[in-house]
Structure formats: structure tokens, C-alpha cells
Amino acid sequence: NATADVEATSRCFLELLRKGQLHPAVLEGKSEQLRMLQEAQTITIKGIGLKHVNLKKASQKLVQKQESESTKPISTSLSAKLDAAPFVHLHNHSQFSVLQATSKMSQMVSVAAENQMPAIAITDHANLMGAFHFIKAVGNHNKDAVEEAQIKPIVGCEFYVCEDHKDKTRRDDGYQVVFLAKNKKGYHNLAKMSSIAYVDGFYYVPRIDRQVVAMYKDDLIVLTGNLYGEVPSKILNLGNRQAEEALQWWHGMFGADFYVELMRHGQEDEKRANEVLISLAKQYEIPLIATNNTYYATKEEANAHDILLCLKEGEKQATPIGRGRGFRYGFPNQEYYIKSSEEMKILFKDLPEAVLNIEALIDKIEPFKLAREVLLPKFGIPEAYLVPNDPDGKLGENNFLRYLTYEGAKKRYATLTDEITERIDFELSVIAKTGYPGYFLIVQDLIAAAREMDVSVGPGRGSAAGSVVAYCLKITNIDPIEYNLLFERFLNPDRVSMPDIDIDFDDEGRAKVMDYVIDKYGSNQVAQIITYGTMAAKSSIRDTARVLDLALNEADRISKLLPNIKLSKIFGLPEKDLKKALRTDEFIKVKEFMALAEESSLSGETIQQAIVLEGSLRNTGTHACGVIITPDDITKFVPVATAKDSD
């Protein structure tokens, strides 16, 4: 309340002046004015009689009044429709919104199943890192569920849409807009946009722009998003005309696949934005969709989620939420969880169409799988070994592999005995049957190139040492016949699976090999594998303790009570099973740890919140040596991002 602030500040200043309590430099040369003030004002400076209004409370009363006026009883038939209609959460963030959400895939699926929801969506911030895990989690549920309880997985993404994603001269985080894939093609368009956001558009956050949206808009559904979406944000910050222009662009771009998203988390700004959004939706005949912007699975996890946000910002939880110096980022309330169908229907009982429209939206979604057969890059073979009418090139690859193997065998063995040729032919037949001749050609080429560059290559590790073909190709340097090593442990004709050859390069040479792979196959077909750093038991204790401002020595004492076991097991296993899994001294410490968790002290609170946060994603990185090579542009298959230390 600016009026109250000005009056209070003025009174304080005049009172200090009257008492001569200001700094001498301020009072210098003003003795006469000070004397006159003190003579005229002999008592404490009083207020001037302003009637101060608590604007926050007044605003809340106004909102409540408006809500009560707008809430009209709906007809019996419409009420029955609403009761029978399915509700589906279409705006959800998982742990893969790193340090922003705590929801695990299993939790999301469980909540959907408990509420008989026919579908559920994942819409992490700008990335699709969790898409495979999400579809797998839903698939695991569906395997054991009856047909009526099947859940449809909806893969989506909440993108930051800015003015120009390549402009890095000024910060522009853009607007947060939700995209949902209608089918597999839509998923690939999401993957393309996510790759562009990270590779070309990363500046503070991964960004795309309208040009990118227009290029990859096919088979996608768009929701207007939260208060940071383009249309709601312009309603609140620029004006209704600008918001309407934005809505016209999105509606023109996506037509019947564009929906106006309404949220009710109990915020005043939502009420203001929703009134205009509803009006615009009616004007342009755009369907309304009710959502809850979820970041944690249950309301009880709200505090743990707030601790996670503090970790991200490097703040203490005791710091008040707000903007500016002395404040920290945090959510305004505890309503950002995966609410039940009943809760959502009550929230939108005055706007039943916002719930009823969901069914038509999810009917547009075609489920798809991301698990697929292994894709290998095309390995160029000499024309002499090619076979006509060989569309996938496997026959030619088998021919060339046989040639290289026998050429190598002549150098490896003084005499090619029947035993050796039988073993080679057997292995080549299994390789041909499994369909992976190209894999051996790629690996032998890679190792040959490494040796030419004087890179140290290991002699062979793991089950690949049991392959005579690998030995003849100089992939390994251990003769499996001499040491009676079994090929079947490496590649079994009765259980077809991808061969796995572990290759060791020296640390300095690894970069040379990587450069060779990029030069041979192209930078757009080669990528390193992303890794995820999660909060383990002890690190979740220490991180939580730091945010809650628990004494460092107490945090160390608690973490030292933990053996190498997950918190979820400590509090999830029956005591007899836990006792079997631990040594006697470890079990005694764990019992002390569990007793501490029951306390209402700060130590107990730390443990309870750490249990929720355990397993949360802490950071991303790159695998030390894992590399993916694809047969075409890698972004046609999976989304990519740029590593922090990459150029």
C-alpha cells in the first residue's frame, strides 16, 4: 500500500528530525529550522488521518464476490454429464524438469489409475528426456490392467516461445506454451523443436520461436498455457488487444487443434486472465480446457518441492517468497499437485464444458511406442561385395564381413584348421541370422582407425573376447580357441540380442576417435549419451539439511548413520527383511536413523523431506564414453541437447 508507506516514512523522518537524531552532516547549517520545528511541534508526529486499506484482503474479497456472482447452478442434465465425463491431466511436469518438479513417472501413472483417468500427459519444460520412461511406465500399468482401466500416454512439451530464438544479444525467455503430440509424427516434430531449442536457441533457457513452430506444427495440439503463456501473459501485462492478436495467430496456425487452457490454483491473476480467456474463446469458438499445472504428485509433497526449488536457486527455505533483494523464488500456494477428478470437477463446476471438452481432445491422440529395433548407420562396402535386390544391404555386409574375417584369420593363425574354419563359419552364420554384420564392420573400422592414430586400444573385455570373428578382425587380441572361450556368451543364436563389444581407449586418444567418428558419419549423425545425476540417500539428506538450515555437524551425523541403501528401502521394507539386508552394526544405526525420522525436530523434518526428494534429478551430464551413431540426422530419431562443455 504505497499511501501507507509514504505516510509512515514521512512520520519517521520528521520525528527523527524533531529529536535531532539525524546524521550531523544532514543537520549541518539547519539549526534555525530545527529550532523552529521543535518549538512548533512539541509532541510526537501523528498520522494525518488516512484510512489505510489492506489491498490484498480487499482484492481477495472482490474476487470472492465476483466468483460467487459468476457461479450459477448448472442444469441437472449437464451436471449428470459432468459427473460421468472423464477428467485427464494435460499439463504435468516430471522429475525430468530438472530441479523444478518432484513427480515420478510411477506416481503420475498411479494417480491416473486411482482416479480411473483414461489418459495422462507429460509436458516437461522444453525437453523430452522423460518421454521413453513415461510411455514405458504407462505400458507396464496397461499390461496388468483390464481394458476399461487402460491409460493412454500423451507425450507433450512446454516450450519457451520467444521472438527470435537465435538472438542472444538480450535475454528473452519467451512465453511458455504447451504442445501435445497427436501421434508418432507429432512426437518427432516435438523432438525437432526440442533439439532446435537446445542446440540453436539456448540462452538462459532453451527457446524456439514462431518460425520454428510454423515449420513443425503438423500433428500437434496446442494449449494456451499457464499465466506465462503468450495469451494470458499479454492479458495481464500488455492488454486485451495484444492478447487477442496473439490468440488469432495461434488459432490460425493450429485451427481445431488449438485450445484455451484455464487454470484455477487460487491466484488473483488467474481470475483476471480467465475472464478474458473465456470471452475470447467464445468469440472465436475455441474449446476451453481445464488443467492443473502440476509439479508434484500429492499435496503432501508441496514442501519437498519447495525445498527442491531452493536447491535450484541456492536459497534457504526460511527466505520469504517474493521478488527483489531479500526474497526468493517459490510457488504462491500448495495447489500444484495432481488433483483427483472430483477435485477438478468441483473447481470447474461453473464451466462444465472445460471438463467435457477433454474427451474430444484425448480422442485425437493415437498411442505410440518409442521402443524400436536397433538402427545401425550405413557402412560403405566395396562394390564387389554388393548383392542385387538387397534392399537393406545385409547380404553385401555379410559378404564383406566374411572376406575381412578370413583375411584376418590368415594373419592370426599359421594354419586354418577345420576347427578354426568351422568356428568362424558358425559365428558368421549366427551374426548373419541376428542381422548385425554392420555392427562388426563399424567396430573393426573404428579400432583400425584408432590404431593408425597411435591410440592405445585394450586387448578385449567382457563376452566379446569369446568371438573368433572379433579376434580375426583385430577387435580383440585374445584367441578364444586357445583359451576355450564360449561364443554363445557373446551372441546366442537362440536368444537374439544386440552384440555388446566393450572397447577401451586411452584418455587422450578418446577425443581423436570421437573426431574420426564425426568426420566419417557426420556431426548430425553422432552424439554422446546424456546421463542423469540423481539425489542419492546421503546427498538428499545433506541437500535438504542445507536448505532447512540444519547445523552442518548434525547433518553429517545423520548421513553417517546411513549404510549404502536407499531411503525408500529403509522405510519400505519390513523390519525382518531390512535386518537380513544389513550387517548388525548397520542395522543398529538404521534403527537410530528411523527413530530420528519420527521426531518433530528439524532433524526429523530433514529426513522426512529427504525421503520424498530421493531419486530426484540433480543435473545432467554426458556419458564418459557412450556414443550413438545413427543412419540419418539424429534429430529424426531422438531429441538432442548441447553439453555444457561443448562448442
Question: Could you describe each region identified by the protein language model?
Answer:
Residues 27-87, 142-148:
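Acidic, low-complexity intrinsically disordered tails
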Residues 66-647:
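Alpha-helical scaffold/interaction cores of sigma-54-like transcription cofactors
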Residues 1-43:
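Acidic, Mg2+-coordinating catalytic module of metal-dependent nucleases/exonucleases
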